[in-house]
């Protein structure tokens, strides 16, 4: 999937949380309805079979309950996408990334080959359809997630290039696949944030640590030999740069990928570097934009939502630009694009008890026109308003309501923008107020069963607030667009 990811280490976040967030985007010309749900251990099969690649994988015992964002319409696989398990481990998968012919020629992708004549079918590897479902229920730390997924990649291979994030309350790890069976992973330093458009991102890698103490780096077992045999290290000084070795520097990156990283880095570090003009240190087309940076101030969930909603506001590249030189308008792929399916921001709060530590912030449809809302992740079920998405358009659920608001607001942008700004702030404020209220109730409740009920009660209250404000905003945006219809006439009937 075409996506955008932000990772924030605990010392870089406003409250000591680890935070991982990703826009899940459909490919061009497609939209994928999503639902926010809980998958229970008893729902998991003993053997998993991929719909797309037909690979079959036995699943271990001891699965954990986890939240997920699967496709609302069945038929093309689960695509669990993002969630938190009962051990407070978060995972988001995947960020589609890039590679190069040197890598793909040395370790080809493991693609499904259908039966032909007397030849039986040959299953493919694992991919975005499968990864969260195969990994998240079976891990108890972010590092365990890297190791389990790495083992699956080495054994079964993959048919696509992907980046995957794992978190617990202490650590964030980012894994990138290399060819069909290889991978690297790096622990995100506590004091930085990471921005990831759709290209291989890790820009430094310590092989000595990966094959030694493994404190900050992990990789596939034969990576050293793989690099040497295929002459993949392009460095002059012996310091491996994975982007050069395994990634891409294509013209398409300069309109589709690097501008997104540039905008996010520029937002959180506006004074660290020069971002524009003839003397710029970095431009939207720079290939050497840092994978991670120490921010100039601590990062909030609202910052993450703003960046993941970006359409290059405040730059000449904004597709909604209405004044000045418009020659570069819409030149680059927006982060908040029309085909955002959902955004999930997973937050592990260290100042809260384990059972209420994980908060999952959710947004549906185009981020440029929506709002996000927090929910407790340690629950047995999710509110119907976010879980009952169907293939048919309906204002009874948050996904389709958000899609309708976005489509109408886009067509009435100047008139509807202030409604959207008020909507987003109102939902964020009310959502935070309800979480604060229920955090206090949970802290005062000695009974574990009652606390579990309170978490679901909180989510129900948050969803009710959200539904009311979303319906009100839909009404206002519909009015603005209706007022702009071409058959409008300024004179009323006598």
Q: What is each PLM-predicted segment?
A:
Residues 118-121, 131-139:
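Second-shell loop/turn segments in exported
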Residues 6, 145, 344:
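Short, conserved catalytic/metal-binding motifs centered on acidic residues
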Residues 61-65, 146, 322-330:
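Short Pro/Gly-enriched beta-strand edge/turn motifs at strand-loop
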Residues 225-351:
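Glycine-rich, aromatic-lined ligand/substrate-binding cores of catalytic
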